[in-house]
């Protein structure tokens, strides 16, 4: 069995943070770092870092620490960044446009191919050369193009309908910004970003400290 399939979701959710911090270290020409030093920067314990990384192999050397470039490369591979991904955004409102304007996606290998919306005032416009198409063409577009991930940025009432179209056209990854928990088959991966949930978590923590 693939070892990665047995990795806990908690470890998986920490990997992007490792990747981001290692990228910053590379930009600052840091060649190596110990788990203790990484702990001070990233906020996890040194023991936790070693345990997490040991899930995927032996990356460090006692007395030397981690080679930053090599570790960043290995975590990139674990995260699947050794392959490019074609993406579409459904919903060209504020959130959709913000995502389309986020230039780091392309640096990570995520290629936003096009956007879809129902608003006649938006259809035909381009955001950073990304064209906004009529959502009525979503199914036919998916039939003709190789798309890996669909990003849903539509209102609550339309999100499940959009998800159904994505699933029907064999999209296996959905990044969902709509405030609804989608119903999809088990072989489709959904990552929810409910903005209000994050804000409510913040207010809870604020009140907890008072």
UniProtKB/Swiss-Prot annotation:
GO terms for biological process: negative regulation of DNA-templated transcription; response to redox state. GO terms for molecular function: DNA binding; DNA-binding transcription factor activity. The keyword Cytoplasm applies. Keywords: Cytoplasm, DNA-binding, NAD, Repressor, Transcription, Transcription regulation. It comes from the Bacteria. Residues 17-56 bind DNA. GO terms for cellular component: cytoplasm. HAMAP family: Rex. This is Redox-sensing transcriptional repressor Rex. It comes from Clostridium botulinum (strain Loch Maree / Type A3). The lineage of its organism: Bacteria, Bacillati, Bacillota, Clostridia, Eubacteriales.
